[in-house]
């Protein structure tokens, strides 16, 4: 008898084995063979076995036991993954607590994520939906904009009252607002370098504002050329005087903000272009559209490089993912496609992009492996022989439209907001470790969140993989704008503000 099984279990197992084997013995040899097996296992003749089997063993008993064990094994594996997932959540939760005892040398800032309860709720848009938010890249200044054309400037160190409110900054909804990445010399000014803010509106205009004095915003110039609603703006990362815009007129344009002239204009979609982003070197751009697609283009020529197709509705937002995300996504992509893709192609380092993330009205957040361009000997870039991007992950926890996406400075967390009144925080590390496609944290909101912005660390290379350096430069602010005219702000209590 087995040391593991009781005597009763041991006999039951032997009976089940005989019952199972009986179906595999040819009929002409059944009496002899089964009787022999019966005597070996039970020390009983076949007739006695038949009587016992009918009385004590259900039909197909061994098969039922075996499938039950398999189901139990799968359940144990699922529970182990869940326990690992929850353990990691607790660890990150402890690091993100505002009153944690973690020492200053730890990574408590770079691992900070907003808690369930916000730090403060701001209400200066008179009930008009907040449509755009941006936090200055190195000053403690936040700009919010709303559907009635109002801009509000906030000092993050003193939120008692806004620094300035500009009513009728545009005659229609302001859909996008962006701070310049760094100071630039204005071509029409002998003054020192300027800090600029750009706004794009449904009135078809882009306005450039001087924020040298954040309490006295001044309009420098107006850029005209779009023939329909302006959806999104993005300053060039290496040539800060250049601004990229996209519009309902299906075009993507590059502007010289010093002169107001259009440097480049191209049509890459068959419908409204909703979102635009630029990679770190400024050579490539991503656009998303009402035509359900995402387009990768050369920002030098407007030439299409690749196309991502997989959303089933309007794609509201698209962003390049930092190269630091690769350590999480390479493994996921390799497992999904069984190493069919050239995940480790060194050309990704040359073009300085690899993955992107998008959110759409099909309620999903998608992560894509971007295609590489063909680079000719003259330096021109062309679509590859396989220009279609690969869908790596599709996250479907939102129950309504995904409106906006932000990437955490540590390149591990992704934050998405949706019309289901949810702010979902995704952990790429947990997605890799647990294989559970669910958010690390989900925060419910009273109003419908429509836009969000997370403060960038005050550091030259914001995609640095030096976590200690990033931790020191981290500014722990997350702002979310809502359709009820409020802005919800999360903040980690830090004694020192890191301002250049």
Curated annotation (Swiss-Prot):
Belongs to the WD repeat LIS1/nudF family. HAMAP family: lis1. This is Nuclear distribution protein PAC1. It comes from Komagataella phaffii (strain GS115 / ATCC 20864). WD repeats lie at residues 125-164, 169-219, 225-265, 268-310, 338-378, 397-436, 459-500. Self-associates. Interacts with NDL1 and dynein. It comes from the Eukaryota. GO terms for cellular component: cytoplasm; microtubule; microtubule associated complex; spindle pole; U4/U6 x U5 tri-snRNP complex. The gene is PAC1.
